[in-house]
Amino acid sequence: LRSLEQAEIEKKDLLEELYPHISKFIFGGFRMMVEHCYGIYNFIYKMSGRMKVEMRPRGKALYKRLKKIMDGEQPDVIVCTHPMCVKAIASYKEKTGLKTPLVTCITDISMHPEWTASQTDIYLAPTQEIKRHLMKEGARAEDILVTGIPVRQQFLDADCRQKRERNRTRRVLIMGGGLGLMPDLKELLEKLHSMQGVESVVITGKNHKMYEEWVNRYEDVEVLGYTENISRYMRGADLVITKAGGITLFEILHSQVPLFVIHPFLEQEMNNARYAAEKGFAKVIWGRREDYIQELEK
């Protein structure tokens, strides 16, 4: 969208906009559940997928804050890339009769009812399989565009797909997703450190605790926090090890770099990993740490 000269784009973090005083606590609680109680998260995720009643955020306070945003921005179109955002805007449209088109950009390769809303005007589906699922849920074929998962322009540039020149040193890029979480990172880095001719780059995202723990630990391991220039590091990698987030998978697909997904444990990430393995652009290590250590040695 930013490449369109006539378009003015305003990006909003809806959680922060709607709940400015508690958004950090909500995010922290979610992160704690994912890191320590992911079994509960997966149970809730699966159960919500079986519910016939559509769950939407409602309430006078929510509508009041959304009205303030709409009145201030006067958008010609609303694009949502997160299920909570989809449900909130759909609920507001239903309540107020807002006519502004709602575009739902699905950023998981697996389908869940959290993405569907009758007030959505256009769906951007990552795959044909997702389009068929949306049609089963009642969406019209003409309202669904199969676009893949959109990635930033830096991943579409021609030089992003240039192969790295081979030398004696192999470079491994490790990423833990938006939360900066990676299973068994200690064992993984120790193994890579012990392998001759291997350098590693770890991107911890906004996980400051992980950054402080690993920065300057090994001279052959570069540790970075949040960076906007992910494509540069993917372009320079011989192998990427990461979580199976939908956007990340499509970024790696555009970068044409070999991919390892280690022990996906969140339900939607497991579904994403299965898709990547079936399509042949990722090696998924489902089991014990010994399994991926053996794969690294090959």
Segments the model singles out, each with a brief description of its role:
Residues 166-237:
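Donor-nucleotide binding loops and adjacent catalytic segments primarily
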Residues 277-298:
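C-terminal "capping" alpha-helix adjacent to the active site of nucleotide-linked donor transferases
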Residues 231, 249-255, 274:
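Short alpha-helical segment that forms part of, or immediately flanks, the ligand-binding pocket
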Residues 2-73:
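Conserved N-terminal ligand/cofactor-binding loop architecture of enzyme catalytic domains
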Residues 235-245:
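Acidic donor-binding loop of glycosyltransferase active sites
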Residues 43-138, 143:
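Active-site and donor-binding regions of nucleotide-sugar-utilizing enzymes
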Residues 237-238, 256-258:
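A short alpha->beta transition loop at the rim of the catalytic pocket in nucleotide-sugar-dependent
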Residues 121-178, 206-207:
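A nucleotide-sugar donor-handling region in carbohydrate enzymes
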